[in-house]
Regions:
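Conserved nucleotide-sensing/catalytic segment adjacent to the nucleotide-binding pocket
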Residues: 67-106
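Conserved C-terminal guanine-recognition region of P-loop GTPase G domains, centered on the G4
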Residues: 97-168
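Helical mechanochemical/support elements of P-loop NTPase systems and associated helical scaffolds
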Residues: 48, 61, 88-92, 119-122, ...
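Conserved G1/Walker A P-loop phosphate-binding module
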Residues: 1-83, 193
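Structured catalytic cores of enzymes that bind and process phosphorylated ligands/cofactors
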Residues: 31-34, 40, 55, 63, ...
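Conserved nucleotide-binding/hydrolysis micro-motifs of P-loop NTPases
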Residues: 58, 71, 78-81, 116-118, ...
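Canonical P-loop GTPase G-domain recognition
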Residues: 3-15, 146-193
Length: 193
């Protein structure tokens, strides 16, 4: 997909701030610091549209990115950041859950995992939650640039085995090398038709 004019739309802290209308939403979920913002920037061909940080847990609201007035990338707060207080974790968890339960325009959920590591307990909980939601989703093994290209398929197989994936699409991705994005676009384009 050729993206011409993506733009940041809004950071929402409540449902009443969500964009109105029926534009499809491609929702990104994943642990803090898994690379959701870098994923958005790479997919949209922009360097700093989504703000990135080396500090986990920076995204505390839901960020909507308007992609050519066709669909939204929706960046949910990261989960599993150990330095968040219990209260912050509960609040963040409820915020994510409320959005996933009540989002009427969700066309696809993308669960981003770090390809280098086994899915964590938090990743497993999120995967199970998404599975039970009956919403369409894919799993992406992000940061594929951090491993040898010859090991990518094996790491994807390991993630699939750990999660028990048999039918869900599971793809590698690298913001650094800007590779594998074409396969992700194929899935997204199918869902936003």
């Amino acid at each position: 997909m050729q993206v011409k004019n993506p733009k940041f739309e809004i950071s929402a802290v409540s449902k009443k701030q969500y964009p109105k209308g029926d534009r499809p939403e491609i929702v990104l979920v994943g642990k803090s610091n898994v690379g959701k913002s870098s994923f958005i920037n790479t997919m949209l061909g922009r360097k700093n549209l989504a703000r990135t940080s080396n500090t986990p847990g920076k995204t505390r609201q839901i960020n909507f990115y308007n992609v050519d007035d066709i669909f939204y990338f929706v960046d949910l707060p990261g989960y599993g950041y150990s330095k968040m207080s219990k209260e912050e974790k509960v609040t963040s968890g409820k915020f994510i859950e409320d959005y996933l339960q009540n989002g009427t325009n969700i066309s696809l959920i993308i669960l981003l995992l770090d390809i280098r590591h086994n899915p964590t307990a938090d990743d497993m909980l999120m995967y199970d939650y998404i599975l039970k939601s009956n919403l369409p989703f894919i799993v992406i093994g992000n940061k594929a640039d951090k491993i040898a290209i010859t090991k990518v398929d094996g790491e994807i197989d390991r993630i699939k085995k750990t999660l028990g994936i048999s039918y869900t699409t599971c793809l590698p991705f690298s913001s650094e090398r800007k590779i594998y994005g074409d396969k992700v676009w194929e899935v997204i384009e199918e869902k936003i038709k």
